[in-house]
From Swiss-Prot:
GTP binds at D58, V59, R60, S61. SUPFAM superfamilies: P-loop containing nucleoside triphosphate hydrolases. Keywords: ATP-binding, GTP-binding, Nucleotide-binding. PANTHER family: RNASE ADAPTER PROTEIN RAPZ (PTHR30448:SF0). Displays ATPase and GTPase activities. It comes from Bordetella avium (strain 197N). This is Nucleotide-binding protein BAV3158.
Length: 290
């Protein structure tokens, strides 16, 4: 069966990084292929005996984007193993990346009005509007806090895991950096006792045994984990029936170092029977409170 990966998302969110990783992993990759050629390209790839292809799609042809859901349906009807990944990032992060690269946004001309040139923020806002229908199609990865190496690792894990009906991901995050855009379910554990205020535990993370032992000693912590566990087990079958391929459960505390990391590790242990299961920790910085 031909494996097809479509990479789409906001310009500057890391599509080129993702495509290079796939190319290094043995995929035949095409960047910025016009959407009207996608079905034909996949058919030819299949006829030529290719096993893995990846295509990056952006908004250079915005008029075609409305057809992407139909194209995705057609590709699946062809019997391909299809994965669609949508990359996103905060507007501030995108603006910073454009400033560092000094690249021109692909929608600059389209967003401009008359003689007034559009600002970068205007271009990003227009692109979000154009891509909004696609964002809910498949798996979303928020690259705001990710290094290129982390993004490559996340894409590799996702592609390796994307063989089952539903990929379950648990990730911890820091509220001080904002709720990740790729979260389907969000649980706030800032109400739990905070190991940060114990000087011996402050430099550690929720993956370290002393922190785990400290948090495990509080009944309220165990009740919180039990409640999250029960909610997910109650509704996971329904998410699967909804033809969803991915479910990302995000758990946040103030700094993303102690409480959220511990809760995610405990949830991952409890759901270890689910295959595939991914665990991600967005922030584990020893100098920031959790």
């Amino acid at each position: 069966m031909l494996r097809v990966v479509l990479i789409t998302g906001i310009s500057g969110s890391g599509k080129s990084v993702a495509l290079r990783m796939l190319e290094d992993s043995g995929f035949t990759c095409v960047d910025n292929l016009p959407l009207r050629f996608l079905t034909e390209f996949v058919a030819v790839s299949h006829d030529d005996g290719m096993e893995r292809v990846a295509v990056a799609i952006d908004v250079r042809s915005p008029g075609e984007l409305a057809e992407l859901p139909n194209v995705i349906t057609a590709l699946r009807a062809m019997g391909t193993q299809l994965s669609v990944v949508f990359l996103d990032a905060s507007t501030e992060t995108l603006a910073q990346r454009y400033s560092e690269s000094r690249r021109r946004h692909p929608l600059t001309d389209r967003a401009s009005r008359g003689e007034k040139s559009a600002s970068l923020t205007d271009c990003i806002a227009l692109e979000r509007e154009l891509l909004a229908p696609l964002r809910d199609q498949e798996h979303v990865i928020d690259t705001t806090d990710l290094t290129p190496g982390q993004l490559r690792s996340w894409i590799r894990e996702l592609i390796d895991a994307d063989r089952a009906p539903l990929v379950l991901t648990f990730q911890s995050f820091a509220y001080k950096r904002g709720v990740p855009n790729d979260a389907d379910l969000v649980f706030d554990v800032r109400c739990l006792p905070n190991p940060y205020y114990d000087r011996n535990l402050r430099p550690l993370t929720g993956r370290d045994q002393p922190v785990a032992d400290w948090l495990a000693g509080f009944e309220i912590v165990q009740r919180m984990i039990d409640d999250i566990d029960g909610f997910i087990r109650r509704w996971l079958p329904q998410y699967t029936l909804d033809t969803r391929n991915y479910l990302t459960v995000a758990v946040g505390c103030t700094g993303g170092q102690h409480r959220s990391v511990y809760v995610v590790e405990e949830l991952a242990r409890r759901f270890s029977e689910h295959d595939p299961l991914l665990v991600r920790h967005r922030t584990q910085l020893p100098d920031e409170s959790a």
